[in-house]
Amino acid sequence: VFSFEQRDGRTDKWGGNFTVGSSDIGLTAEGPLGEKSSVLLSARRSYLQFLFDAIGLPFLPTYNDFQYKQKIKINQKNELTIIGLGAIDEFGLNLQDDTSAFQQYILGNLPFQTQWNYTIGASYKHYRERGYSTIVASRNMLNNRAYKYIDNDDSKESNLIFDYTSREMENKFRYEETLDIKRFRVKGGINYELARYTNNTYQLIPVGTDVITVDYQSELPLQKWGAFVQSSTSIFDYRLTLSFGLRADANNYSTSMQNLLDQLSPRFSASYKLTDTWSANFNTGIYYQ
């Protein structure tokens, strides 16, 4: 199980670094924005397309990604975190005149591809004496595009034999409460998600002496909601940690999935600290997708 978190930007002064690797180049900058805020910015771009072109490969990938994080400490009990992630990926073709027969075959079948995605969100936390509240709102989107022309000649629209565009969009909201009650930590919350998937596909498929035209547009809107509660504690001089949780999820994809009680997911885990560097772990549960 992995857990990734963006680190906070520096609060003392501005700084940054510039990196050059074997396949990409990157820039990072961070520093304070006033007395109560810090920001972290980064951008990276690959130059694999130049390497692939130099060694004569028929495809030319280019990757770009961006990150942004700002943390605002409103006061001792309230803080706001804003994040942004984005990426633009392009998969071009190396249309040189001196390609081999094998490369020409690959070029005749590989489509041009582009993909971009982003995630933006904000997290607000309010701290109390024995716990804190968390409110999270976010939006993410993924766009995929692939197309192909006969002999890679896009001078005529009639040469188009494949055109595919899909989009996935999700708007999410989550509210959580975390409480410390004696030796127990209790966490509970609710979530709601509004999602939409669209697909536009055009393709000419040769079948014998005939050509079948596939041309359709589809859309799938979806709403999801859920709730969870979890409690954990440590016993035996904090060597044994026990955790029990219960989660329920539902959505409007079909009537059989709209009742939270029909998708109850109990979970249990235990971790025993054998030494300072070794521990034994046990996990079990029921999961729904």
List where the protein language model places each region.
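N-terminal periplasmic accessory domains that precede
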Residues: 1-16, 27, 31
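Periplasmic-side early beta-strands and strand-to-turn transitions of outer-membrane beta-barrels
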Residues: 10-12, 32-115
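Solvent-exposed loop/turn segments connecting transmembrane beta-strands
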Residues: 17-26, 57-60, 253-261
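Feature captures outer-membrane beta-barrel proteins of Gram-negative bacteria and organelles
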Residues: 25-36, 40-44, 64-72, 227-229, ...
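Flexible, surface-exposed loop regions and adjacent strand-edge segments
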Residues: 57-62, 96-106, 150-160, 203-212, ...
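Face-selective signature of the C-terminal outer-membrane beta-barrel domain
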Residues: 71-89, 111-257
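Surface-exposed extracellular loop regions of Gram-negative outer-membrane beta-barrel proteins
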Residues: 92, 96-102, 143-145, 198-207, ...
